């Protein structure tokens, strides 16, 4: 696929035609640092020891011109990344911050910047289908494939309680 765009994948880094460099780093907090630039984290709600990785890797995007972007299928509310998603990481123990309300889910469905400076955007399968994905996805077939809890997590962007999780995160990190 990459060859169609004149890009050779070598396992190191990729330099795009506009000069941008893509580096693929591990999710190991001891090795996923040291560069600067935009940070993109994929499937962060499934990364073990996310808190430590977030602390060190997000520093790569310290300059104002860089941003940190995390995207993921939700997992359990007990996952460390959920504290970043719901704002509790930012609130910490600060009484003033603990009193700050975050936007409702309806606002996040159109995208919004939250009090912690993080842009949150929820895209459920229903919105994607309404936006044109219907040419590639039969939503009723997908709904029929899963039980309601699993569908809500995988396609409805809903976090589940650990007891209802499709995959028990604590078992995955053993």
Each model region followed by its residue ranges:
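Short, conserved secondary-structure transition motifs
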Residues: 11-19, 73-79, 125-132
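ATPase catalytic-site recognition across NTP-hydrolyzing enzymes
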Residues: 112-174
């Amino acid at each position: 696929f990459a060859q169609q765009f004149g890009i050779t994948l070598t396992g190191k880094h990729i330099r795009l035609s506009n000069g941008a460099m893509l580096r693929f780093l591990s999710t190991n907090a001891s090795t996923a640092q040291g560069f600067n630039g935009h940070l993109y984290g994929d499937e962060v709600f499934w990364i073990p020891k996310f808190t430590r990785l977030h602390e060190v890797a997000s520093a790569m995007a310290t300059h104002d011109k860089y941003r940190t972007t995390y995207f993921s299928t939700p997992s359990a509310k007990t996952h460390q990344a959920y504290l970043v998603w719901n704002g509790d990481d930012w609130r910490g123990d600060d009484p003033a911050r603990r009193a700050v309300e975050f936007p409702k889910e309806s606002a996040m469905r159109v995208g919004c910047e939250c009090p912690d400076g993080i842009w949150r955007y929820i895209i459920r399968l229903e919105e994607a289908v309404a936006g044109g994905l219907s040419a590639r996805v039969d939503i009723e077939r997908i709904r029929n494939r899963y039980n309601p809890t699993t569908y809500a997590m995988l396609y409805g962007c809903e976090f589940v309680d650990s007891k209802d999780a499709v995959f028990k995160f604590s078992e995955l990190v053993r």
